[in-house]
Each structure stands twice: as structure tokens, then as C-alpha cells.
Regions:
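Beta-strand->loop->alpha-helix junctions that form or flank phosphate-binding loops
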Residues: 66-69, 262-263, 281-290, 308-310, ...
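Helix N-cap motif at beta-to-alpha junctions
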Residues: 319-324
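Active-site-proximal betaalpha loop/short-helix elements
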Residues: 130-132, 234-311
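Phosphate/diphosphate-binding glycine-rich loops and adjacent basic-rich segments that engage nucleotide
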Residues: 181-238
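Glycine-rich phosphate/pyrophosphate-binding loop regions near the starts of catalytic domains
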Residues: 40-200, 205
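Acidic, Ser/Thr/Pro-rich beta/coil linker or hinge segments at domain junctions
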Residues: 27, 41-50, 58, 333-375
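Solvent-exposed alpha-helices and their adjacent loops that cap or buttress functional pockets
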Residues: 67-69, 77-83, 149, 164-169, ...
Length: 375
């Protein structure tokens, strides 16, 4: 029986883009096979695709306690046996907006550190400016970074800045390092059956601010009052995209099993990431989720689901029933809104929406709803 072999034929480019498919020739059957390239949509990689890539990763250093894992907000490194603390390391870019990009960059990265029960300490950033940028604009971004670091007691320790050809708007990629006592480490994968699922503040906080900042003129044309737009712009400060404070309070008064800040893909993807990380089933009542009226209004204008919109400012907590009361008292004392929206169960890694009609599994969103404002 003749051996099968496959030839990959690559036509010459000749000053143009290569064809959008690859061609294989099966020598036995004499058939020409075309396989179309799958072009990925904007936004995070789908969870199942990312999981396949991460499974190929090899950790060479035994001091890595937590490496790249689905749902985890940061990596964890043990600096040595004599140390009583872990180093917690994260990276996060800002790509959806350019207004207040320096503030965004610091806060979304310190949020990731806070999710591990850690205190953010050191920040660095790669700042890529498009051609045509001026010194005034660059200075503005540096001022935003400086002010945010000063506010949250973080040291800005370096990075890289350049004018980059081929990009249309500025991109910031931030990197944060923090510390946590070894016995205080919290992970997204720590949720246990029987835990209550808490949501601190509401959803779509960051998305609401982005819509107002990026599409102000369009919203005004659609008849949205300027007062609503002004308030929505300030959502990054009030209710705020920072969750360091509520995370610290929760860790101080209770034995939090898991924390996660839902970002791209909103609350829906955030809960799914926690379920995957902890290998548990999460039951959620979406009617108990806080959605601000400004968020509902702006999402309606762009045909977006606030539950699937970038959600920095929200905080997911998995806590044992015995710790629910201490957290409730502490949050109320500090005027931090929260609600019990679900429960963690033993079962397959998934999220079930529970309502009077029954239950339905929530599927991961392939792209964040905020991208609809750019379509």
C-alpha cells in the first residue's frame, strides 16, 4: 500500500497578501483540499482556545507557585524558603480607550494583584504612541500614571516609551508586582462547594465610562442628556473601577476562599473563569445583579448586554457561609454596595443561571460587548 504524504503548496506573494487559505495535496486520493484560515475576532482569546495553548506551557523554575492558568488574575512566585511572602505578578493592557489611559493602566493592574489577597507595590508600563503624538499628550499620560501610583501607594519603577508606526491610537501595557503573606494568598481557583458568591458593586462600570468617553458626540446626537454622559464618564471614579479597598476589607474580616475581578467579557465570563479555575459549578440569580441605570441606558443605545460588558470595578467573592455576616457588617460600615448573587456547588466547571423556570448554562462570550461601539 503506497504511503500517504501531504504537500503544502505556498504560492508566491508577488507584492500582495498571501491567499486567505492553505492548500494541501493528498497524493493517494489525488484530491485538492482547501482549509480556510480562521481569523480571530477582536478581544480576549476564547477560554477553550487559550486553555489549549497554556497546556503546552512548561514551568522550569520550581519557585513558581501559580503560573498561567485560566481564571487566575496573576502569577505567584516564592522568592525563597526564608521569605514569609510571595511575589505576585500581573500584566494587563489598555486597548479600548485612550482617555485617562494612565489611570486605567495602574488601576486594572493593581486590581489583579488585589485579587490574590496581595498589596500592589511596583508598576511599570510600555507606552506606545501613534505617529503624530505631541509632548503635551505624552506628558498628560505620565501625569496620570504618577497621580494614580501616588494615590494607591505604588512605586512607578520603569518601562518603555516610543512613537510606534502602524497604530492608530495609544496603547498602554501595564505590569504590576505585589506582595502577600504566604498564609494570606487567595486565588480564583479557591472557590469551594457551599460557598456563597458575592458581587461587590455593580457590573459594566468600566464599560459605561468607556461608552461615555469614546462616543460622547454620538450619544448627544441620539438625545442622551449631557448630565447623564458627564456622570457616566466619572464612573471610573464613582462607583470606581478600583476594587483594592473592598478586597482588602474582605480579606481582613473573613477567610475569603476566592476572588476575581471580571474584566473583558463582563460578569458572565468572570463567573465562568472562576468556575473553571476552581473546577466547581456556580449557580447564579442574575436578577440580583446590580446594574446602574446609566449603564442600562447607554448599553441599550448600542445594543449591548451589560452582563457581558467589560466590568472593572466589580468584585466576585466566594466565601464560606460562616463568614457572610462579618463581610456584610464590614461592607455596610464602609458603605460598599454588595449582594449575594449565587452559590458554589459540586459539579462540572460551569455557570448555571437559576430562575423560576429552571436553570440554563451560561456560555462564554467570544468577545466583549463594548466592541459593538466600534463596529
Amino acid at each position: 500500500m503506497p504511503a500517504k504524504f501531504i504537500l503544502r503548496l505556498t504560492p508566491p506573494i508577488e507584492g500582495r497578501l498571501a491567499p486567505l487559505h492553505k492548500i494541501w495535496f493528498n497524493a493517494v486520493g489525488g484530491r485538492m483540499l482547501k482549509r480556510k484560515t480562521r481569523f480571530l475576532k477582536t478581544g480576549k482569546l476564547e477560554i477553550r482556545i487559550l486553555k489549549k495553548f497554556l497546556e503546552r506551557n512548561t514551568i522550569l523554575d520550581p519557585r513558581v507557585v501559580i503560573g498561567p492558568e485560566i481564571g487566575e488574575d496573576a502569577a505567584v512566585i516564592d522568592p525563597g524558603r526564608s521569605a514569609d511572602r510571595y511575589w505576585v505578578v500581573t500584566s494587563d493592557p489598555i486597548t479600548f480607550t485612550t482617555e485617562m489611559i494612565g489611570y486605567y493602566g495602574v488601576v486594572v493592574n493593581l486590581n489583579d494583584i488585589a485579587m490574590m489577597g496581595a498589596i500592589p507595590k511596583w508598576f511599570s508600563a510600555v507606552l506606545l504612541f501613534p505617529e503624530g503624538s505631541d509632548l503635551k499628550g505624552i506628558e498628560k499620560v505620565f501625569r496620570q500614571i504618577h497621580d494614580a501610583c501616588h494615590r494607591f501607594k505604588v512605586s512607578f519603577i520603569g518601562g518603555h516609551t516610543e512613537i510606534t508606526p502602524g497604530i492608530k491610537k495609544m496603547i498602554l501595557s501595564g505590569h504590576m508586582i505585589g506582595e502577600v503573606k504566604k498564609e494570606k494568598l487567595v486565588t480564583a481557583g479557591g472557590a469551594r462547594p457551599g460557598d456563597f458568591l458575592l458581587l461587590v458593586k455593580g457590573v459594566c462600570i468600566e464599560g459605561t465610562s468607556i461608552m461615555a468617553r469614546e462616543k460622547e458626540a454620538e450619544l448627544l446626537k441620539r438625545g442622551i442628556p449631557s448630565s447623564v454622559i458627564r456622570k457616566a464618564k466619572r464612573f471610573i471614579f464613582d462607583p470606581g473601577i478600583e476594587v483594592l479597598r473592598p478586597a482588602r476589607i474582605a480579606c481582613e474580616v473573613s477567610s475569603v476562599h476566592a476572588m476575581h475581578d471580571p474584566t473583558e467579557g463582563g460578569l458572565i465570563n468572570g463567573m465562568i473563569e472562576m468556575a473553571w479555575a476552581s473546577d466547581t459549578e456556580i449557580e447564579v440569580d442574575l436578577e440580583k445583579v446590580l446594574i446602574y441605570k446609566e449603564s442600562r441606558l447607554l448599553c441599550q443605545e448600542f445594543g449591548m448586554d451589560p452582563l457581558g460588558t467589560i466590568a472593572s470595578g466589580a468584585l466576585l467573592l466566594a466565601v464560606p457561609p460562616s463568614d457572610l455576616m462579618p463581610i456584610r457588617k464590614a461592607f455596610r460600615k464602609n458603605s460598599i454596595p454588595f449582594g449575594v448573587i449565587g452559590k458554589v456547588r459540586k459539579g462540572p466547571a460551569r455557570v448555571l443561571r437559576i430562575d423560576p423556570k429552571g436553570s440554563k448554562e451560561l456560555k462564554p462570550l467570544p468577545r466583549d460587548e463594548i466592541l459593538k461601539i466600534y463596529d
